[in-house]
Amino acid sequence: EMWVSKRDLTNDEKLPGATLAIKDMDGNTVTTWVSTDEPHRVTGLHFGESYTLTEIRAADGYALADNITFRLIQKSDEDGNHLEECEVYYLTTKNILFWKWDDWKLLDDATVIMQDDITKVQISKKDLTTNEELPGAELIITDEKGSEIDRWISTDAPHYMERLPAGKYTLTEVTAPDGYAIAERMEFEVLPNGEVQTFEMFDDTIKVKISKVDITTNEELPGAELVIKDKDGTEIDRWISTNGPHYVEKMPAGDYTLTEITAPNGYKVAESIDFTVLPTGEMQ
């Protein structure tokens, strides 16, 4: 008999919930089981033959481990008589076709130890124009069933998570930082490996276009003094119109009033206009 112990790579503790299989060199499955918090006893393997320990499904939040090739050598007593006990050796090279005897290393206690690394996910919320980390966005991650997995406010560093089960997820921006438009939902997939998997969501700035036009020609009208105030009466921007539209960037979503202070010579002052900047960057 021999033993298989499934462990956490980060702390070497026993790891339940992984589906494992032992296959012979022809690829035939000899036995399968789900790991528990105790080593698994394996019997019925043949002395002298090589086998492969394969992880079919990792425990939630863990990466799939590499295959381990091993063989059983029957023990003998001092007189050369075979015993019903065995020694277990594992192959240190990944080339199972070409190896030397020195490539086989003896395992302690006839136990094959397979370790799983944890999954690592990094979420970056970035400014579309600068590609820099963007603080102040409220974000949530949901799984395929719509269950909330994590919620946080972005900072000037990526958001890091460990032990996220492999699978498909949706990243949603609940609220954008002031002056930015809410990004579209983003689907992503976490793979069962131990690498840091990075996903990025970009926010564009809100750009408000203000045109002062002649009502008869619909052409841009220079020379008007205009001001935008928020719902509290705080002045947001003031300018003199030109031959082109005026743009205001990073304007927080909310309600505003556009007022003409002075009209160009020969024109009457227009009535104030109330408008709303939506979180999507659109105007109403």
Range-by-range predicted roles:
Residues 1-284:
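Solvent-exposed loop/turn and edge beta-strand elements of beta-rich ligand-binding domains
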